[in-house]
Swiss-Prot record:
Lineage: Bacteria, Bacillati, Cyanobacteriota, Cyanophyceae, Synechococcales
SUPFAM superfamilies linked: FMT C-terminal domain-like (SSF50486), Formyltransferase (SSF53328)
Catalytic activity: L-methionyl-tRNA(fMet) + (6R)-10-formyltetrahydrofolate = N-formyl-L-methionyl-tRNA(fMet) + (6S)-5,6,7,8-tetrahydrofolate + H(+)
Organism, as annotated: Synechococcus sp. (strain CC9902)
Keywords in alphabetical order: Protein biosynthesis, Transferase
Record-listed (6S)-5,6,7,8-tetrahydrofolate binding positions: 110-113
Function (record text): Attaches a formyl group to the free amino group of methionyl-tRNA(fMet). The formyl group appears to play a dual role in the initiator identity of N-formylmethionyl-tRNA by promoting its recognition by IF2 and preventing the misappropriation of this tRNA by the elongation apparatus.
Top EC class for this record: transferase
Name this protein carries in UniProt: Methionyl-tRNA formyltransferase
Entry-linked InterPro entries: Fmt, Formyl_trans_C, Formyl_transf_N, Formyl_transf_N_sf, Formyl_transferase-like_C_sf, Met-tRNA-FMT_C, Met-tRNA-FMT_N
Domain of life from the UniProt record: Bacteria
EC number: 2.1.2.9
Length: 338
């Protein structure tokens, strides 16, 4: 099978490696152009570009594939049988979708039609979904609207952050895409309706939700929220949820909500703290306790929340006792909105 691969972040690397290892001919890799990143704002290649070059594959980096007619022709001349897309970062135009005879297929990190769009992993965590998964979808001009060929579900635990969940979903995408490509090859060529009928795809229902682009304010911890919502913000937007501490930014990296009904899902250290503080008596964001070797307990609009790991502006990451010592917090101190 001659495959044209489209992807950009680290999330897309396992699928490229899996397809290459399965013996398919990767005729080209399309990724986003090099971007300036980090403190030094150095021009850096995407994770997929680095991976593709290590495999000796041809790389294409259109700034905007929709209007880059020259790149579109170069890709058409590769005569790929199929296009595989995982987190590319641009919407493919109809002219590109119609190029490969076996279609364009996308590995999407949600249970479609829930969380169509660019941030399905983050939104599944932010909204407290009990499960998520991966779908292999035939691409259309609409955003993540196509019929689903394969799908696999994955439970979400309370202690998972977006990085950990993303790693699991990226590996799951790789496994599922290799299986999907074999099915697509066996189904053979024909009109799109004929191919999709032979593949017995599932058409998406109408009860959809959209994973909108995240805004700056989404990353700001709102201590007036309940503990569980604050926890979901921290874990869903890992490692970027932030608050203020003595006029410096503090990235909050790991929390546990001190909620009785979640006692089976939190750590032994957190369970030992249940019931020690009366709910809602202190101003949200107030330090209620600095627990040696555990972390810092903070008030919310409801039950308290335990901060287990954080990173103060200009400092390294600290957890448990190191966090207590670095912040030098006292009961009654307050975190600030930033």
């Amino acid at each position: 099978m001659k495959i044209l691969y489209w992807g950009t972040p680290e999330y897309a690397v396992p699928t490229l490696l899996a397809l290459h290892a399965a013996g398919h001919e990767i005729v080209g890799v399309v990724t986003q152009p090099d971007r300036r990143r980090g403190r030094g704002k150095q021009l850096m290649p995407s994770a997929i570009k680095v991976c593709a070059q290590s495999l000796g594959l041809a790389v294409f980096t259109p700034e905007r594939i929709k209007t880059d007619v020259g790149c579109q022709k170069e890709l058409a001349d590769l005569n790929a049988d199929v296009s595989v897309v995982v987190a590319f970062g641009q919407i493919l135009p109809k002219s590109v979708l119609e190029q490969p005879p076996l279609g364009c297929w996308n590995g999407h990190g949600s249970l479609l039609p829930r969380w169509r769009g660019a941030g399905p992993i983050q939104w599944a965590l932010l909204e407290g979904d009990s499960e998520t998964g991966v779908g292999i979808m035939a691409m259309e001009e609409g955003l993540d609207t196509g019929p689903v060929l394969l799908e696999q579900r994955l439970p979400i635990s309370l202690d998972q952050n977006s990085h950990d969940l993303g790693e699991k979903l990226s590996q799951l995408t790789a496994t599922l895409m290799v299986e999907a490509v074999d099915l697509i090859l066996k189904a053979g060529v024909g009109t799109e309706p004929e191919r999709l009928e032979r593949l017995n795809v599932r058409y998406q229902g109408q009860e959809m939700s959209y994973a909108r682009m995240l805004k700056k304010e989404d990353f700001q911890i709102k201590w007036g929220d309940p503990a569980l919502r604050t926890h979901r913000r921290v874990m869903g937007l890992y490692p970027s949820a932030m608050t203020g501490w003595r006029n410096k930014r503090l990235k909050v990296l790991e929390t546990e909500p001190l909620i009785e009904r979640l006692s089976d899902e939190i750590s032994e250290e957190a369970r030992a703290l249940l019931g020690r503080w009366r709910t809602g008596e202190d101003h949200p964001g107030t330090v209620l306790g600095c627990i040696n070797n555990v972390g810092i307990v903070v008030s919310t609009s409801g039950c308290p929340i335990l901060i287990r790991e954080a990173q103060l502006e200009g400092k390294g990451r600290c957890r448990a006792q190191g966090l207590v010592q670095q912040l030098a917090a006292s009961v009654g101190d307050r975190f600030q909105s930033f």
